[in-house]
Amino acid sequence: MNIKRAKEEIEHTVKAYLAKDALGEYAIPAIRQRPILLMGPPGIGKTQVMEQAARECGVALVAYTITHHTRQSAVGLPFIRQRNYGGRDVSVTEYTMSEIIASVYAKMEATGLKEGILFIDEINCVSETLAPTMLQFLQCKTFGNQAVPAGWVIVAAGNPPEYNKSVRDFDIVTLDRVRRMDIEPDLPVWKDYARAAHIHSAILSYLELHPQNFYQINADVDGTQFVTARGWEDLSNLLNTYESLGLQADEELIRQYIQHQKIAEDFSAYLDLYYKYRDDYGVEDILAGQAKPAAFARLLQAPFDEKLSLVNLILSGLETRFSASRRADAAADSCYAFLWETKKAFAEMPAELAQEPNCWAQLFDQMTADYEAETQKKRTAGLLDKPTLEARLQTAKTLRSWEKELLRAAAPDADAAFKVLRTQFGTLSDARDTAQQTASAALEAAFDFMEQAFAESQEMVVFVTELTLSPAAHAFIAENGCERYFQYNKDLLLDHRKAALNQELEAEQRRHGML
């Protein structure tokens, strides 16, 4: 099973386990809600899919790496309590609440969400003293004498023994009480995630050429060498930040993330070439509609991997513009909705309050503060993905700048105050239009170059396919259109259908002995 399918299964499980009957009771009793056990190699994305699943299901998430805990923190600390049993006073041992269970209650209190996912990572790598506690947890859904609260779905994750020497096998009794999912690395599935997460285009381009280097764990005389999906993503974040700071990544830096010597050397060499192609071909000039004549001449002699790298560089430049347009669009939409809520609030302000100095700015300040508080609450609950969080933070920043304009204007009435805000929104709307026009012009320039350089070759197929698969590109084109994209995409679909029909025809002829 790949990680995408595992995420879908987790989401379906959460919905099923939290479904209620006509009496308000859970449709599947807690005793029949089997914990999910994810087994897969390290760095494959198990923790990330838990965050995504919780966010998309609208529930809280408490995540623990159990190898960081002792028996005392997992079970609780012992203390002596006096009891009377059968007329005889005795001293008995009880336990404080488990730190993990306490964290669940703390999360419920902080977020207001009463249902969630309790995720325990590296569950089969615990110490000998903690192993019985983990078995009890999976079998009985308790830590010590404290049960996991109702409405919390248990998901655990572990590594197969070939990846971790401290792994402990679960017995059949335990395995018969869980839902085990074995997860394997899958590059095409990861690329779907990578496009949405804006993984550095050099990494995507490199893995397109060398898919075997996506995930490897090799043991030799010098120790274990490895490269994981987590390593590629973390390296991507660093490369993007380095580029924004004007810094250059070298092989020594890359080896800190790609801890496989041959792959680190290979990617480092490719990254140098990638940047060289960007400068030599003038990708920004191409997207500005000013491609250099020398670029076309060089492409005539270029090998396929160089051509593919150039296509990915063009796609990366477009992706930057599509994302900027999306952010500008989201900011304008969010502020527009807030603007009309403000107009309604202005109209409903009591007459006696409307006479006070700066009353409109004060009301706007309170509404903005409420918006910021809502954002923080959702952020604490983990209900905002990165793009949504960035959009809300940018909206709050914009609203604060509008508040300053309101204070400066000292509007005498609601109409005058709203006019100030509407003027500010006009500037925001203009910025949205500019971002959209910039992205559209770059897309047309890219098609001009691709047609002149590659016509309808394999490189054009890659270009159009990647535009189709990119969430940012797909959303932009769906909203703003692009005739040449639609035409090439239609032709590609027809070609695929013809190829599929030819394959079916050949298969039919073979069955009848005609070939």
For each feature predicted by the language model, list its residue ranges.
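Context-gated lysine
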Residues: K4-K7, K15, K20, K46, ...
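AAA+ P-loop NTPase catalytic core and its hallmark functional loops
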Residues: M1-Q212, I217-D220
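Terminal-proximal interaction/regulatory segments of ATP-powered molecular machines
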Residues: L300-L515
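Alpha-helical lid/collar subdomain of P-loop NTPases
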Residues: A196-L353
